[in-house]
């Protein structure tokens, strides 16, 4: 949610355990003082990084990472404002875990969780897009009445549990952590201000976990099974031109393995070329596996020929192709009116962003069972699920959800 304190919380984690060097931090602190922001805000870290990223400066990706005892955590920022939901859709589809930050302040929590609040929408999106692990940070515990109130935390935990359960999450498997991203309570170490908090604990079929702070909850994430045995699919997030090296597409391996020497094809443009090298965390890799965010250098292809939303695959093993049309199950989350044949919204699938026409609404189905409830409905509205034939304005690389989940889920808005 916009003011739940996501940036401050994230900034705090990057600041304390991340890839930001001392010099940069001192520079930020000095600027903050000069601007009369007496106290240095962690959110600033994120604002500075975002500003640089928006100016087209290739940010050293290390800045968007921090380390726990067990993992490298890469932050896929999903700011809370309405127009950012699209980023969230393309970004969330790459997340292994979502951290939902809710503000505990009087009135703040209620606003976020209200009928059209964003907390609700974000949690629903994360689940719909296949992010099955969730952590809830109950933030701004310092601004409850009285500060660090146990009853306020319990009230919020109860309320959030009930609605994430409706969405499909199992609350018993979700860590609820009372925090202050600003003061640092329960972020990296147990807070002395909440002696009543005995810790979070989760139960799931893979076993139990418990801890006191947010970083431990991140440490307790289960690493998802990585589909290395499937054909290669790597949606491009960006394409850089790097002096002395050449064209470097960047993206996350979703399925399969990418290694130097692979002859890749980029769909839907059908451009074929050889991979010269693969790099992650500034180190050359002999192979990249699902979950790896990598840059790879390709021969004889200019930056202009490739774009975000293209998908790289192995030309010799079930390569990806563009689709001129496709059939999908669509769930209408919150759309103001009726949707009928001919409706042409913008669709976001993996990293692609493209106008698509609802050519034919074939049937309405039950959201939970998928059974048909009505053939050829005139229109569909909020809450409905339907099977629809979609026609993208130009070829789009999509796959069946069964075979390649990250390329089989999308959002239209």
From Swiss-Prot:
Record keyword Phosphoprotein present: yes
Subcellular location: Cytoplasm
Residues that, per the record, bind GTP: 1-7, 77-82, 139-142
Example of a GO cellular component annotation carried by this entry: cytoplasm
Pfam families: GTP-eEF1A_C (PF22594), GTP_EFTU (PF00009), GTP_EFTU_D2 (PF03144)
One Gene Ontology term of the molecular function aspect: GTPase activity
Modified residues annotated as 5-glutamyl glycerylphosphorylethanolamine in this record: 287, 360
Domain tr-type G: 1-228
PANTHER family: TRANSLATION FACTOR
Domain of life: Eukaryota
Protein name from the UniProt record: Elongation factor 1-alpha
Keywords attached to this entry: Cytoplasm, Elongation factor, GTP-binding, Nucleotide-binding, Phosphoprotein, Protein biosynthesis
Role this protein plays: This protein promotes the GTP-dependent binding of aminoacyl-tRNA to the A-site of ribosomes during protein biosynthesis.
Major subcellular location class: cytoplasm
Family assignment from sequence similarity: Belongs to the TRAFAC class translation factor GTPase superfamily. Classic translation factor GTPase family. EF-Tu/EF-1A subfamily.
